[in-house]
Amino acid sequence: MRCPYCGSEDSQVKDSRPAEDGNAIRRRRICPDCGGRFTTFERVQLRELMIIKKTGRKVPFDRDKLLRSFEIALRKRPVDRDRIERAVSGIVRRLESSGETEIPSEEIGLQVLEALKSLDDVAFVRYASVYRDFSHAEDFEKVIAEISAKIARDPGE
C-alpha cells in the first residue's frame, strides 16, 4: 500500500486485528522508506455501487463521505465512534444487499436520517435541516415538535 507521507509504493503490516464487529480488518502499517506509521481498514465490498445525484449525474459510492456526513451532524455530540461506525456499516450493508447497483442519493439521505434519529436528536435536526433544505424557523419547529411527540409517546427511548 502506498505511504500517505512519502508516496513510497511499499509498506509493511505491523499489526492486524478485526474491527467493526468483525466486518473489517484494521491494519497498522509502517513505511520502510520514511518510517511513517498509518492505519488502513480492509472491508468486504459485495458490489460496486453508483449513486444517482438529484441532477441525474452518477458517482461512485464513497463510504468515507457517508461517514463524514455522520461526523458533521454529530460534531460535539456525546456519541461513541463505535456507534457511528456501526450505523455507517449498517447502511452500507443494506445498500449492498439491496440487489441494486444504482441508488438515488435521496434513499441514502433517508437512511442517514433514520440512523441519526436513533443516535442523537440534535444531530437528526442538524442533518434534516440540510437534507430537507430548511429555510424558515417553522421548519425547525415542526421537526422538533415531531421529536417531542415521540419522546412523550416513548419516554424510555
From Swiss-Prot:
Keyword terms: ATP-binding, DNA-binding, Metal-binding, Nucleotide-binding, Repressor, Transcription, Transcription regulation, Zinc, Zinc-finger
Answer yes or no on keyword Kinase.
no
Q: What positions belong to coiled-coil segments?
A: none
How is its cofactor bound, per UniProt? Answer: Binds 1 zinc ion.
Q: Where is the composition biased (Basic and acidic residues)?
A: 11-21
Among Pfam families, the record links this protein to: ATP-cone (PF03477), Zn_ribbon_NrdR (PF22811)
Looking up InterPro entries in the UniProt record yields: ATP-cone_dom, NrdR-like_N, RNR_NrdR-like
What ranges does the record give for the region Disordered, renumbered to this chain?
1-21
Query: Where is the ATP-cone domain positioned along the sequence?
Result: 49-139
Q: Which GO terms describe its biological process?
A: negative regulation of DNA-templated transcription
What is the documented function of this protein? Answer: Negatively regulates transcription of bacterial ribonucleotide reductase nrd genes and operons by binding to NrdR-boxes.
What name has this protein been given in UniProt?
Transcriptional repressor NrdR
Question: Which gene codes for it?
Answer: nrdR
